Swiss-Prot record:
The keyword Cytoplasm applies. InterPro entries: KH_dom-like_a/b, RbfA, RbfA_dom_sf, Ribosome-bd_factorA_CS. This is Ribosome-binding factor A. One of several proteins that assist in the late maturation steps of the functional core of the 30S ribosomal subunit. Associates with free 30S ribosomal subunits (but not with 30S subunits that are part of 70S ribosomes or polysomes). Required for efficient processing of 16S rRNA. May interact with the 5'-terminal helix region of 16S rRNA. NCBIfam families: rbfA (TIGR00082). It is found in: Cytoplasm. Belongs to the RbfA family. PROSITE patterns: RBFA. One of its GO terms (molecular function) is ribosomal small subunit binding. One of its GO terms (cellular component) is cytosol. It comes from Thiobacillus denitrificans (strain ATCC 25259 / T1). Gene3D superfamilies: 3.30.300.20.
Length: 124
């Protein structure tokens, strides 16, 4: 591995690969439906992992999914310990990722600006 690719990043990448499969196969909580893990950040000493996720639906669905994930975090951590070759698996903290919503809002603003610009003839 290159020197500029730290171990914490590799652990985060592995958690990002393993976690969706574990959630899909092992978590039986109906609040945790279809979700996407967008990013995992592991701190330098690999004690904590912040897991960013997105789901479809409204604010109530996001909150319910977050509650389900928080409730299952200990179980998911223990399942990760069986799959990963680590002495200590990081404690998982789940955070709803609003970047997709922000991106869609920006796209709508750009489309609106382009449509408004198209209505006005260009000055030449």
């Amino acid at each position: 591995m290159p020197k500029d690719f730290p171990r914490a990043r590799r652990v985060a990448d592995q958690i990002q690969r393993e976690l969706p499969e574990l959630i899909r196969q092992e978590v039986k909580d109906p609040r945790v439906g279809m979700l996407t893990i967008t990013e995992v950040e592991v701190n330098r000493d690999m004690e904590f992992a912040k897991v960013y996720f997105t789901t479809m639906g409204g604010e109530a669905e996001h909150a319910a999914c977050l509650q389900g994930l928080q409730r299952a975090s200990g179980f998911l951590r223990s399942q990760l310990s069986h799959r990963m070759q680590l002495r200590v698996v990081p404690k998982l903290t789940f955070v709803y990722d609003r970047s997709v919503e922000h991106g869609m809002a920006l796209s709508r603003l750009i489309e609106t600006a382009v449509a408004e610009d198209a209505k006005h003839p260009k000055d030449e």
